[in-house]
Amino acid sequence: MDNCVAAKIMDSNLSSQQQHFLQPHCFFPQNVQQLSPAEEQQASKAKPIKRQRSASPELMRCKRRLNFNGFGYSLPQQQPAAVARRNERERNRVKLVNLGFATLREHVPNGAANKKMSKVETLRSAVEYIRALQQLLDEHDAVSAAFQSGVLSPTISPNYSHDMNSMAGSPVSSYSSDEGSYDPLSPEEQELLDFTTWF
């Protein structure tokens, strides 16, 4: 006797409410066939077959998928439109973050030349760049304060006005004082001063 006949015999012994809770739909093959009235009578006269319990993993998974619709509880189903809107918002957010990193990459030293900078590398480079700019500002403020207090006095030379005019286009600048000129800038400092060409 096949599973279909056994299922029909067992179904006839239980009420419909008991069947709903005790027998998950995955317990028997999905291709259950309808019995003709003659086959149903023959199956009802046959000896009831006991269901054998198996401890197979497939059976255990099947038992966990019981249908609880009879209790009036069902899991909330998300609407496809709501999911689509949420996914679209997330895509837009990621796009904006990526555009922000691309813009930042263009403003950090070596960022425009290095297209493969990761987000972490871009952030580290930006932090280093900001610290270097802050150090330059602090040094400039210290020199300005020294000029204002009279400790240092700038000497105006014919090259001074030329140096001031060329500062916007050139990353190298020099200051003149009574004691002489400053040491030339290192390549790293020149690279940091190059930011004026980006704006």
Curated annotation (Swiss-Prot):
GO biological process: nervous system development; neuron development; neuron differentiation; neuron fate commitment; neuron fate specification; positive regulation of neuron differentiation; positive regulation of transcription by RNA polymerase II; regulation of neurogenesis
PROSITE patterns: BHLH
Biased composition (Polar residues): 162-179
Region feature Disordered, mapped onto this chain: 37-56, 162-189
Keyword Nucleus: yes
Distribution of this protein across tissues and organs: Neuronal precursor cells.
Assembly and interaction partners: Efficient DNA binding requires dimerization with another bHLH protein.
Protein name stated in the entry: Achaete-scute homolog 1
Species annotation: Xenopus laevis (African clawed frog)
Lineage: Eukaryota, Metazoa, Chordata, Craniata, Vertebrata
